[in-house]
Amino acid sequence: MLEALILLSFTFYFLPMLLAILLDSKLGDPTILGHPIIFFGRLIGWGEKRFNRGKYRRLKGTLYNGLLVGLTLFLSWYLLEQLLNLGSIGQMVALILATVLCFYMLSGKTLIDEVSAVFREVDRELEAGRRQVARIVGRDTAQLSAQEVRTAALETLAENLSDGVVGPILSWALLGTPGILTYKMINTQDSMVGYLNERYRAYGFFSAKLDDLVNLLPSRLTALFLLLGAGRLDLTPFVLREGKKHLSPNSGYPE
């Protein structure tokens, strides 16, 4: 009985993520099929257009975006649970679906490819490097030096390693496939409405704070992994000290 439970746990819990990591390392972001993040973005954008106006914007943003987070967690869990109860065919569909969804939520290879392209281009020509890094950063790159282009690319790699790899895998470890989907919904909300400007300050307040919360551990684990990879654990006090100085409670640690 115990052996059967272990096999079942491996097959329907661990195997989808292992396969997803393998697929991501070989293929990167899939481009043939529609991406779930695009669907998330449409839902978030629909609500923003309708509710980010007039009075009570913070309340409306909290209710709508909180509802999206809750529905993502519940519906993904419910769908997989129902499939698992349909016998061997349903279980196979659940396994494939969980694998594909986890694969879609990872962006390790794509991130590495983008940063590698920046280094190749800046080594070839500074202006080409500026154009390439502009694809992955939100700042003005027109006046960056070659070293600043490389630094910007590495900072983006560090921060997005948390959002695109460590955070999703940790969320999956805690709550399975529903967890990784919910994490990416929160992350997508923050990237769309979690800003401090006049338009989003009130409406995106909940999304920004929730994203800060769910990334507290991933950001610090990412920093630890980077220090381990570089063999520089002696820099831990520096990272802990300087990370606190960033405007974001999380971004400063991996950067």
Language model features with spans:
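Hydrophobic alpha-helical transmembrane segments
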Residues: 1-181, 186, 194-255
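RNA/tRNA-interacting regions in translation and RNA-turnover enzymes
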Residues: 191
